[in-house]
């Protein structure tokens, strides 16, 4: 097990494909990554190798990678308290990914639900082998850093089980090369729903962007989205996920951003109707996104500093990854290169 100051090591990553983070993925993951810097030896990466399992425009991918890194820093990741890097800057990911491919059964890989879901939507001709082997690269991402813990939500549990299975399989077949990680269950965060369809999770794949609170949008546009959020024909501000999903979603967002209890908010808006709630919430959201947007812009306007942070992170990541890969190569029986 690898430790820094006796802290468990944790690894997580985020896709660079979305441009702006939205409020749902910020609250669901990124905010907790920021907190984990104080309790863990934390490694965080922008997973551009994973991004190309589906078609990407090269210029957009490059830009989105920078924007994702800038937003992580704007959210509070501190390069002195965590290791932040871009996945493709550490070639050991792809190298260990190949070893993981070679110890994974075809049937085992076929059962991964994410592949089944995406390939069903795209059809066989448009589904890449990269998408099929995506989970094995994810396993390599984790094992390279001898991560003790992996932050997981419900949709990632299957990938963590595969990671544990492959780590055990490799260790038993060849020799102990990998830490077998455990799940770090992310705190039960309030689920944030689409403003236009409050029965669906806030997501980039939504039918319309009107329901998304993008953190890099113009604050005025964000305020307008909040004020236009779908509610119901009633006027009572009350939390009830079943019968009042729209209002409940607005109360959840308000509570999550301010720390106010939902019951307290219900009392505050008793007899005031939805208009007052939406107006105040629009102000709360704008107050949150405006400084976030400004901090992100500062990093993007100073590419030298951003590049230096990512280079430092990649150097630290490679120092750990290279050691793990060398050990795995030795256990497999590869002839060592003599320099």
UniProtKB/Swiss-Prot annotation:
Q: A GO term (biological process) for this protein? A: tryptophanyl-tRNA aminoacylation
* Keyword field: Aminoacyl-tRNA synthetase, ATP-binding, Cytoplasm, Ligase, Nucleotide-binding, Protein biosynthesis
Enzyme superclass (EC): ligase
Name the domain of life this protein comes from. Answer: Bacteria
Q: What is its main location?
A: cytoplasm
Assembly and partners?
Homodimer.
Function, as annotated: Catalyzes the attachment of tryptophan to tRNA(Trp).
Q: What is this protein called?
A: Tryptophan--tRNA ligase 2
Species of origin reads Streptomyces coelicolor (strain ATCC BAA-471 / A3(2) / M145)
């Amino acid at each position: 097990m690898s430790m820094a100051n006796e802290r468990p090591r944790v690894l997580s990553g985020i896709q660079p494909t979305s441009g702006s983070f939205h409020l749902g993925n910020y609250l669901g993951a990124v905010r907790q990554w920021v907190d984990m810097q104080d309790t863990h030896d934390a490694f965080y990466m922008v997973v551009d190798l994973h991004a190309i399992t589906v078609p990407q425009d090269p210029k957009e991918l490059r830009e989105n990678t920078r924007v994702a890194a800038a937003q992580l820093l704007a959210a509070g990741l501190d390069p002195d308290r965590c290791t932040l890097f871009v996945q493709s800057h550490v070639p050991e990911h792809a190298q260990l990914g190949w070893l993981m491919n070679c110890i994974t059964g075809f049937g085992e890989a076929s059962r991964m639900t994410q592949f089944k879901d995406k390939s069903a939507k795209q059809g066989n001709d448009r589904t890449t082998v990269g998408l099929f082997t995506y989970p094995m690269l994810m396993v390599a991402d984790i094992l390279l850093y001898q991560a003790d813990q992996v932050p997981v939500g419900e949709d990632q549990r299957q990938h963590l089980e595969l990671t544990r299975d492959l780590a055990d399989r490799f260790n038993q077949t060849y020799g102990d090369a990998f830490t077998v990680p455990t799940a770090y269950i992310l705190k039960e965060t309030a689920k944030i729903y689409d403003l236009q369809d409050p029965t669906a999770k806030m997501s980039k794949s939504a039918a319309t962007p009107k329901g998304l609170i993008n953190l890099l949008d113009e604050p005025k546009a964000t305020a307008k989205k909040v004020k236009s959020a779908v509610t119901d024909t009633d006027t009572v501000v009350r939390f009830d996920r079943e019968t009042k999903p729209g209002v409940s979603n607005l109360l959840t967002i308000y509570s999550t951003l301010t720390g106010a209890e939902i019951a307290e908010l219900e009392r505050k808006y008793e007899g005031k109707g939805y208009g007052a709630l939406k107006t105040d919430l629009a102000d709360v959201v704008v107050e949150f996104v405006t400084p976030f947007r400004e901090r992100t812009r500062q990093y993007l306007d100073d590419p030298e500093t951003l590049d230096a942070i990512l280079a430092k992170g990649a150097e630290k990541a490679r120092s750990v990854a290279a050691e793990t890969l060398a050990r795995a190569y030795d256990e497999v029986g590869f002839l060592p290169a003599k320099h």
